[in-house]
Amino acid sequence: MGTIYLFRKTQRSLLGKLAQEFRLVTADRRSWKILLFGAINVVCTAFLLTWCSSTNSMALTAYTYLTIFDLFSLITSLISYWVTMKKPSPTYSFGFERFEVLAVFASTVLAQLGALFILKESAERFIEQPEIHTGRLLVGTFVALFFNLFTMLSIRNKPFAYVSDAASTSWLQEHVADLSRSLCGIIPGLSSIFLPRMNPFVLIDIAGALALCITYMLIEINNYFAVDTASAVAIAVMTFGTMYPMSVYSGKVLLQTTPPHVIGQLDKLLREVSTLDGVLEVRNEHFWTLGFGTMAGSVHVRIRRDANEQMVLAHVTNRLSTLVSTLTVQIFKDDWARPVLASGTMPPNMLNIPEHHVIQMPSLKSTIDELNPLTSTPSKPSSPPPEFAFNTPGKNMNPVILSNNQMRPFGVGYNYGTTPYTTTFNQGLGVPGVGNTQGLRTGLTNVANRYGTYTPGQFTQFRQ
């Protein structure tokens, strides 16, 4: 039998969770204005789609897609209000700011997909151009233009405002900027209006309405229906060119990349951190954009053994907090170990020294372990104590004991016979032609002491 839960917590459905979050957003009065504009947008879009069907105009359909994009921007603004109300949770420890980025990315990508659909339909119309009815073409153009401008200028959309300023300029903005400079050279008084970077959404709304007005005039004068398809292609290309830089910027934020314009500032701050008192090395640094205008990062700092961890942590956080709002700093103390040779009383099983050879093994630490890891910041070597040295056995390394069961004459001090090669490494120094020596013979017995902890002859006892 399974475990019986008397008060089991009920699982809410997805619709129930969405309804709960929607009630949380609507509790704020600032969101009522967004909801009102959203309702008007749905009604206006429905009328425009009906007029697109009655006029059979592909250009008006492409322009109506901008009204649908306005609906996505209103939803993004609503998500922005929701993010400000939510607090970080165990699942989303950095907060919910990335939902804003995801909403902007989804809105711009959907707008580009709509532009590609218009290009596909326009390519089919170039083969067989249908007749265009201009009865409601001009009315639909001005209704869409008025509503788009009114929505963009009335609702403060923080995510799209940040992306439009931070992303690279579109080709439409660059061409308009060139024309504005030429115009301001003739009329200097217009420099305050045209020279600043224009809002890309307002620019595409005006450019699309201008293309529809030209289409209306050419169809009314010459019945030139192909201009409607050409205007649809122009509006689709302008839409794609305007949305592409924003989707690229928001996509890079979702991929947790570091903005190029702050890399130099971060390198300067990391160099300042590496020169702080007690800091030996700064490594494993990683910084990324958490949301629009907020950065997060993590860094590992290696400090001296005698340094104050809290003081170093406070200084590092103070230096990096100017750019990184959410920062994780891990402090590591310098991990050097003092090597000490084995000293002390001899084990009982080593009293019969002539039956054993004690060979001190070299250090198992390789040269690769002594190298500092490559980091983007310079490391400062620590100052080891005078008795510290590399490639020496540690204090916890026991000597290796190899048994020697070869018979020897009792009571004779030295045997001057010739040692065969088969017994070279059983007794003595292992040099051919040298007699068998009794007792302990290693390469270190007659060497002067370097470390002060090993005394010659400590283990060299003889049994007479």
Swiss-Prot record:
Cytoplasmic side: 1-33, 86-98, 156-200, 245-464
GO cellular component terms attached to this protein's record: Golgi apparatus; trans-Golgi network membrane
One Pfam family named in its UniProt record: Cation_efflux
Entry keyword Transmembrane helix: yes
Domain of life: Eukaryota
Keyword GTP-binding part of the UniProt annotation: no
Membrane topology classification: Multi-pass membrane protein
Chief subcellular location: Golgi
Keywords: Golgi apparatus, Ion transport, Membrane, Transmembrane, Transmembrane helix, Transport, Zinc, Zinc transport
GO molecular function: monoatomic cation transmembrane transporter activity
Subcellular location: Golgi apparatus, trans-Golgi network membrane
GO BP annotations, alphabetical order: zinc ion import into Golgi lumen; zinc ion transport
Transmembrane spans: 34-54, 65-85, 99-119, 135-155, 201-221, 224-244
Segments on the Extracellular side according to the record's topology features: 55-64, 120-134, 222-223
Subunit structure: Heterodimer with SLC30A5; form a functional zinc ion transmembrane transporter.
Known function: Has probably no intrinsic transporter activity but together with SLC30A5 forms a functional zinc ion:proton antiporter heterodimer, mediating zinc entry into the lumen of organelles along the secretory pathway. As part of that zinc ion:proton antiporter, contributes to zinc ion homeostasis within the early secretory pathway and regulates the activation and folding of enzymes like alkaline phosphatases and enzymes involved in phosphatidylinositol glycan anchor biosynthesis.
Family label: Belongs to the cation diffusion facilitator (CDF) transporter (TC 2.A.4) family. SLC30A subfamily.
NCBIfam families: CDF (TIGR01297)
Protein name: Zinc transporter 6-A
Naturally occurring in which organism (per UniProt): Xenopus laevis
